[in-house]
Amino acid sequence: MLLLNPGPVTLTERVRRSLLQPDLCHRESEFFDLQDEARQRLVAAYELDPAEWTAVLMTGSGTAAVESMIAALVPKDGKLLVIENGVYGERITQIATQYGIAHDVLKHEWMQAPDLAQIGARLDAGGYSHVAVIHHETTTGRLNDLGAIAEVCRSRGVKMLVDGVSSFGAEAIDFAGGDIDAVAATANKCLHGVPGAAFVIVRRSALAKAASRTYYLDLGRLAKLQDQRNTPFTPSVHAYYALVEALREFDEAGGWRARHAHYKALADQAQAGLAARGMPLVLAEGESSVVLRAYRLPQGVTYETLHDGLKARGFVIYAGQGGLSKELFRISTMGAIQAADVERLLEGFTALTQ
């Protein structure tokens, strides 16, 4: 079965075999070697200076990393502006509300790109320490323009907290601009690991001021203990095995730029084939990521018909969310997928929509 949902992904055999490594106590030096390698490779993935940046690992989904980031890095006297244009921006608002973090929301329609003028106007009203934004909003497949948002923040001295859960490892992220304090992400999307290992790439200067609002996801404590080759709790050891093996593969294949190019070729192939079959891209050309794209359901064919028919042929696609569930479907090209797989997928669409 090939998974065309936005994580978990279809694994390579090499990563799958890594799950068969010997059982390992998380208090032994061998585990801390594994933890150290994962952290070092994550920082190196975007060629970051380890004196300025660190990777903090945790056991959980990508949402755990996002929650840890938001809970720790908005100071008690700070204020957060959440940019919403999909389900995952709304989730950050829910996290901020749950923790009692001072925040406002700049809400957009799900099909809308963030309005830079509105962001600037909100920030000009004053009082904001941070902006939270989703890099790749998988609700629609939109790649929000981090660079443009960063420019708005930079002139106003506001830092960014980025949900990079479904972009880290495949899309460009400008860590060098000085505007980003942290990016939250996970092993089981663009890095091709398995669910259970998540992380925050965080600026050390921001980490030094981290608030402690949560017990299990306390970013400052996790970082401190990991720097000491320690861990506060039992991690998902085999998920760490898989993450390290996936990162080795990632580096050997050419890093995020090579992964971006591979995803783009597959996504463009799928997009062209689906358009020819009457299923156009939902967003305007150039607004989608290379990771996932959303398509209009064909006239007279339900999502359930497509899903079940394609699953019988060995493919899992993904439904639209919320009010979009009757309008669109989504296809991700993450994981161990090749051009021949996309061609077989398109043949399946032909059979189901004729």
Where would I find each of the regions flagged by the language model?
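Conserved active-site segment immediately N-terminal to the catalytic lysine
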Residues: A176-N188
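Conserved PLP-binding catalytic core of the aspartate aminotransferase-like
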Residues: P280-L310
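PLP-dependent enzyme catalytic core of the Aspartate aminotransferase-like
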Residues: E327-Q354
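Active-site C-terminal subdomain of aminotransferase-like
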Residues: T10-L11, N188-A272
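Substrate-binding/gating loop at the entrance of the active-site cleft, primarily
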Residues: I83-I101, E109
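Conserved beta-loop-alpha segment that forms the PLP phosphate-binding cup at the N-terminus of a helix
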Residues: L42, E52-L81, G89-I92
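A glycine-/small-polar-enriched, mobile loop at the entrance of the PLP active site in fold-type I
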Residues: M1-M58
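Active-site phosphate-binding strand-loop segment of PLP-dependent enzymes
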Residues: A113-G169
